[in-house]
Amino acid sequence: MKTRFLTLLVASLALCGALYPVTGTAARTGFARMQYDGGGDWYNDPEILPNLARYANSVLNTDFPIDQNVVKASDAKLFDYPFVFITGHGNIRWEDREVENLRNWMLRGGFLYADDDYGMDQSFRREIKRVFPELELVELDSSFPLFTCFYDFSAGLPKIHEHDAKPPQAFGIFDENGRLMCLYTYETNISDGWADPATHKDPPEVRDTALRFGCNIVYYLISRG
């Protein structure tokens, strides 16, 4: 089962970036977190990606590395990672060279998951518009396959942390072939639920819901090819 699953992963990512592909696969390099300037607390809860990898490995029978990898949008090693995560509480700022590199990476197979940890919405929307001025963030409802590809979230995006009583929303940016290049979750704070139990004192059922949705993100990416 594990061998077949990882073969599917490699094949899917190769198809996504066939023009000039991202060289890494999540099975080999794992997930990465994006470091950025602007003071937006990019580094909070460093355990969340390792915890997601552990959870995915336990339920998907995968073998993702349990690492906290950090990249900047300007780094050449960005192309080693097909899955990059960004979060924070405040301002994100990308330099022009970072915007260009990030655009190239996403067009060549990279996937960016952005989770607003309350306070980064305005700056993320501004900066991602610089990356893709010709594209829009499209709201995704529960009919989008990611919501039901592994665990059933047909009732909609779960609310993990309450900030200001707004409904949780998911948005996507797609390439010309309909491939999801960027997922942005707002007013839910999914990734806080991936933290260690002592970090936010979330009850087990809340953490499990967050990790299940994270598992859906991973499964959707590796099975869509």
Give the ranges of each region predicted by the language model:
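Bacterial N-terminal signal peptides
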Residues: L8-A18
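Aromatic-Pro/Gly-enriched surface loop or interdomain linker
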Residues: P21-F83, H89-G90, M181, N189-I190, ...
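Positively charged n-region of N-terminal signal peptides that target proteins for export
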Residues: M1-F5
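Surface-exposed patches in mature extracellular/periplasmic domains of secreted proteins
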Residues: T62-K72, A114-D117, L135-S143
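Short alpha-beta junction capping motif
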Residues: F31, F83-Q122
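An acidic, glycine-rich "communication" segment
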Residues: R28-G30, G38-G39, E47-I48, D121-A198, ...
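Alpha-helical scaffolding within the catalytic cores
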Residues: I66-A73, E95-N101, K166-Q169
